[in-house]
Structures are given as C-alpha cells and as structure tokens.
Amino acid sequence: ARRLLQVRPDARVTVLEKEEALARHQTGRNSGVVHAGIYYVPGSLKATLCRRGVSLLKELCATHGIAYETCGKLIVAFDEEERAKLRNLYERATANQVPGVRLVSGAELRDIEPHAAGLEALHSPSTAIVDFVAVAEALASEVRAGGGDVRTGARVTQLKARGTQVVARTPSGELTFDHLVICAGLHGDSVARLAGANPDPRIVPFRGEYYLLRPERRHLVKGLIYPVPDPRYPFLGVHLTRRHDGEVLVGPNAVLALAREGYGWRTVRLGDLAGTLAWPGFWQLARAHWQMG
C-alpha cells in the first residue's frame, strides 16, 4: 500500500485489517530477526527479496527512528557432518552477497559469543533485530500520510464482483474497489477462496513455543546463536535470540496448532482443525516429518 501510493500518489488506497490494532499475529509474534539471506538458493526469488528487503527496512527504520540493532549471528557446527553442511551454507551466503559473512574456528566463535562452544561457526555480522510492531505502525503512518486509509476492525466476510469492480463486506458495511490485493497471512488461502481464487498454497498452522532466559542470565547471549539446520526438515532448529527489548528467547519448537490463531494448547477451533485434517497435503507433510514428533 505504501509503495503504491509512492508510485501513484493519485490512487485511493484502503488497507483492511481485521484486528483492532496492527501486527497482532505473525508480524508481531515472531522473534524479530532481520535475516541476511544465508539459507536461500542463490538466484532464487527468496534470496533476491531478502537482500532487497533488508535494504528497504534499514531505510524505513532510519526515517522513523526505529532501533535497528545489527547484533550479528552465529550458526554453530558441533561435529564433522554439521561442519560440511555449514560450509555449504557459507557458499550460499557468499553467492547471495551477504555482507561480511565468514567461517570462524571454535576459538574465534568464543571471541564473538564467550559462552558458546562448537567446532566451527558461520558468522553473519549484518544479521539484525528490530521491533516489527513498530515497523508495521510506521508503514501504516506513511500510508495515511500519503492519503491512504488504514481501517482496523475491518474483517472481510464476503467478496463479490460487481461489474468490473470488487465489493468487500466488513462489519461496518460494503466497500467497493477497482482492484483487490490479498495479503492475509494465516488466512491467505481462506480469503483467496472468498475471492474465487485458487487457495493454494494451503495454510497448515504450526505454533512455535519459546522459553525466556531469566534476566540474570541474559548476559550469556550477546546476539543470535543458531544450530546448523537439518535440510530434511523445514525448520531452522532451536536457537538463542536476543530481542529488541533485551529479552533472550530459547526456541522455538514447532507443534501443530489446533487453530489458525492458536497461541496456546487450549485454543481449539474445530473449523480450522477440520480443514487441516481434511486436506491430503497435511497427511503428506505428516508422513514426511513424523520422526520430528
């Protein structure tokens, strides 16, 4: 929305947010890491957008006075098998032009993280942390400043065509648009279905659970410490993450959520769960990764 108004200042842009405030879900419920582009296949869209996104995010944070802490990241190998995987990651990182990335010995990694230990590590000094809630609010402020509208509490319950236009029904009434862009996060497939579009890729909700280090133990972690990821699984593994507010997270795991917005074990929405269990792709995923639990 912000970019559209920059390119087309005469456009009338409206953002519909179903919650009463911004960043209530994925945007505000992550570890706050700004990844540098280490893991992605060189030349892929993910790699390209990651590096471009880092540049744009730094500019936005500087403009709005949002703290952008370049704390750095270590990916630590503990044995020879992991060391081989680590060197493959290093090759990817250099191909993706990640700034300053290098391999460090076990002794050198202790200079960076005195309380860490390992055989070898990949050091990415440009990896950063940021408050993504503040980022979302800054983007919304620019949309409003550019003449756009950001409406909270505007859950879209119906989409229908009316001639060449699209009509969106919300609790406050109907809104008519010439064009509609769906960016609905965990509900992306269901909102796409409302629009009559292909709902693939389908959403299977997983919840990541973290521990917090006690305040008197936070000094043990200066930046970000990750394991070498297992390429057989679609997760980066349990890691140590310093946040923008000074807290240090340990995690996450990845457990099947019983609701799309299921942030605790007791949150169960039968419609969401039934949708997951009825989709054949979920069972393919389960068969492929059942050993992880």
Indicate residue ranges for each PLM-predicted region.
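Dinucleotide-binding Rossmann-like beta1-alpha1 core, especially the glycine-rich loop
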Residues: 33-108, 112, 118, 237-238, ...
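Flavin-dependent oxidoreductases
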Residues: 159-268
